[in-house]
Structures are given as structure tokens and as C-alpha cells.
Amino acid sequence: MTGSYGTKRILLLFMAALLALVFGPGAVPRAHAAAGTGYWHTSGRQLLDSNGQQVRMTGINWFGAETSNFSPHGLWTRGYKSMLDQMKSLKYNTLRLPYTNQLFDSGSAPNSIDYTKNPDLQGLSGLQILDKVIGYAGQIGLKVVLDRHRPDAGGQSALWYTDAYPESRWISDWEMLARHYAGNTTVIGADLHNEPHAPACWGCGDQTKDWRLAAERAGNAILAVNSNWLIIVEGVDGYNGDNYWWGGNLQGAAQYPVRLNVANRLVCSAHDYATSVYPQPWFDDPDFPNNLAAIWDKNWGYLYKNNVAPVLLGEFGTTLTDTRDQAWLRTLMAYLGTGASGMSFTFWSWNPNSGDTGGILNGDWTTVNTAKQAYLDPYLLGAFDGSGDPGGGDPGGPGTPPAVSCKVAYTVQNSWQGGFTAQVTITNSGSDPLNGWTLEFAFPGDQKVSQGWSATWSQSGDDVTAKSMAWNGAVAPGASLTVGFQATGSSSGTPAEFDLNDQPCEA
């Protein structure tokens, strides 16, 4: 193995020298830059990265920091890195992260967190927890949109201000966040206020109610601090007597566009839901679901189709219990389009504890609602750069890995007819630290890994491989880590042997 590497290295050096002679200094061909690099901007209806490549958000909402928990939900059950790894494994590339202005108050202490699963969150403020989530999201190639979801943790507000949290506080908190994350290209945009609705209006001219004017004030204040952010502006609910979902009616943007002081920063955002959330009249139209495209065109799709601005469908979700919900979701995804040129979206929600819709995760906060995920799968583009995967070979460098002493504990967590989830705890029982690891085992039956977390999972026949990620490759002597997966098949067959870096482990 070492000799093979040395031969390849000599050949590579020779080829590099030859290319330099043939093409001259600086002429060696360079790899194409990874999509999603840097800050993003707009061009007509498209989003472009810092290299001018077309990009698209195909993401998910993870709520909780807008509630009195002041942190993303589910951390009472799992680690935040495990959550984000699973999002990446499911091919989401963007995280819409709701928050409340109350989170930044001195008395707002994060709570309902299992610190044995999230030890690095112990003692942190709400903003510091957001820093951790955003930091790791960027490390694994996810982008983040911040969503001012509520002024206080008690509930949604129709207007962007309340008596307790006036407009001045709304704007100053946005300015603070824009400064705080300046230079951090993981955070690409600000969703200014979630779901404005009556008495909010669009284009009415009333400074206390006109959401379009308020969005201009906040958007330009943000851009004065951080000119790189996308400014994401949702609609209202009604325009000229035509009512739609809260935050989804952008009809007024045709006559009254949002005016920003920095060009190519505006993204228009709508929300759309199924009959499980509210029985809108169009769900009972005899032409349903063929009537939906015209409704979407009228309220927000025209902005994309007429090349006015990119559109982000910031929230859409369903329990899928009604057959009309199934038709709605199938039709909506097709309407948004495929590939990098389609309309952006962030599904509501990752969380299973959204009362109207449920989530991508089931109630155990671990297994996936595969029925919902199947509707989204063809449209998900996957994470951008920053995955931390060093490519082929051992992450610690070329050559033969050191001998390993290890213990493995395999535990089935949940099982149902046709599937199960399991976790594998790896303990370094040797005297040397691990700097990157590869775990291998074989299923005794027809089990197939469908997804995994906290490792890069693959399967060939019965043989399963889990490779360390950038954040958990280093394992000190005596330390343990836990990875997990979801699989199809019976949970009764337990792997008999486990190898770590090609060395057998005690099981």
C-alpha cells in the first residue's frame, strides 16, 4: 500500500511537471469550483453563487429557537450534529432556522437540552447555540437562512412589531445578526418576518401597516451592515380583496416592488399549505389539482416565470392523511421544477412536533417519514462543499493504519414491520488515538441501510461500511462515539463481527 502510493505520487509529480512545460507557468488546468461557494446573489429569477454558478435552495425548516426553549427542538433526544448529519444524508442543502427576538434578551435561557448528547452546548446562550448549529452546518456543506419567526416566544404576530418588541428592536436585532455573521458564508440570507397578515398590507402606504415599506427599511438597514446577504421578503395574506395563505400573497409586488439599495439581493418568498392545515376553497374545486398552477402563478409564481426575482417557497407541509394533500404535494413539487434552475424551497418541517403538519422525522425524532421524503427526493440537490470528506484512503494520511483495539456495541433502537433503526457505539480500547476510522460489518440477512447519521454509510451486498466524518474522526484512548442508521428488513439478525480500520473489534 505504501509502495503503491509512492509510485502514484512520482507519476503525479511527473505529470504536473510535464503540464507546466507544455502549457507554461500557471497554465495547469484547475478543477471547476464547487457549486454554492461564498455568498449568493440574484440575476433575474436565478440564484448564483460567488463564482456565478446557478444554485438553488432545496432545504428544510428546523424550528424551536423561536419558542420558549430558545434552541432548536429535539435536542432533548439527540445531538445537534447528528440531526444535521441526517439532514445532509437526506440531500437537503439549506436550513431555514427560525428565531424569536426574545432569544436575545438576557433572561432567555435555553432549556430542554440533553447535555449528555450535546455537551458543547452546556452553559451557552441562545445566540451561542445558533452559532454552534450554524458552524457545524457550514462544516458539512449546508447553507443557512435566518428566519425572524416571532417577536416573542408566545406566538406569531401579524405585523413585524408589537408593543414589547417595536420596529426599532426588530431592525436593531437584524443589524446585530448581520454584523455577528459577517464573513461567515454559511449564512446567506435574512427572512425578515414570518407570515405577515392582516392588518398588514402591501402597497397601501400606511407606515404602520405597509409590509412592503417595512421590508425596505429593514432590508436596507441590514445591507448597510452586511451587503452580502440575500434579503428574503414574504408576502401578505390579502391583496385587493383576494385572500391567500399568510405570507403567501405577493400579487402586490408587481405594482409595488421592494426597493433595496444594493442590487441583486432580493428574494421573494411565499408559504403554501395543504388542506390538513386549512380547507381553502380551491381544494374543493372540481378541477383540483389542475387548478393549483394558476393560483400559484397569480400569487407568487409569476415573479419567477417573468424573470423578476428568485422565489423561495419558505414553508409548505402536510400530514398526507388526506388524498387531496397527496395530490397537492405531488403537483406543487412538479410546479417548482427540477435541477439548479428551479424555484427554491424549504420544507416545513424537520420536526415531528408541528401540530398541523408533522415532520420529516417521525415522533421518535430519529426515523424518517419515508412517504413524505419520497415526494421530495427527486428535487433535492444535496449539500454543497465543506463535507470534510478527504476522498479515498485513510483520513489520517497515506499508508497502513495503526493497529486498533476496539469494542463495538450494536443496539436496535426501534423496529416495525419491514424496517428498524439501530445504533453502533464504538469504543477505542487501545492506547493510541484514532485519526479517522472505517467501521465494517456484514448483515446476516436481507437488511439494507436506507440512511444513516454521524458517519458516511454505504453498502455492497451484505457488507456495510461506515466512515468517520470531519468532526468525529479523532477518538482518544478510552473514548466512545455512537453512529446510527435506518434499514429495511428484519431487526432480528445481528451482525456477528465488526472491523475497525481492518482490525477486528470485541463485540
What role is predicted for each listed range?
Residues T323-P402:
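Aromatic-rich peripheral "rim/lid" segments of glycoside hydrolase catalytic domains that contact
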Residues I426-G430:
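Asparagine-centered strand-capping/turn motif at beta-strand->loop junctions
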Residues P477, T482-A507:
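Terminal connector regions
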Residues P29-R96, P110-I113, K117-D120, G391:
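N-terminal carbohydrate-binding accessory modules
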Residues W76-T77, Y161-D163, S168-G189, H193-S341:
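Extracellular glycoside hydrolase catalytic/binding regions
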Residues N414-Q423, N435, L481:
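Short, solvent-exposed loop/turn segments enriched in Ser/Thr/Gly
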Residues W76-D152, W211-N226, D325-G342, T346:
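Aromatic-lined substrate-binding rim segments of carbohydrate-active enzymes
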Residues T400-G418:
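Low-complexity, acidic Ser/Thr/Pro/Gly-rich terminal tails and inter-domain linkers that flank the onset
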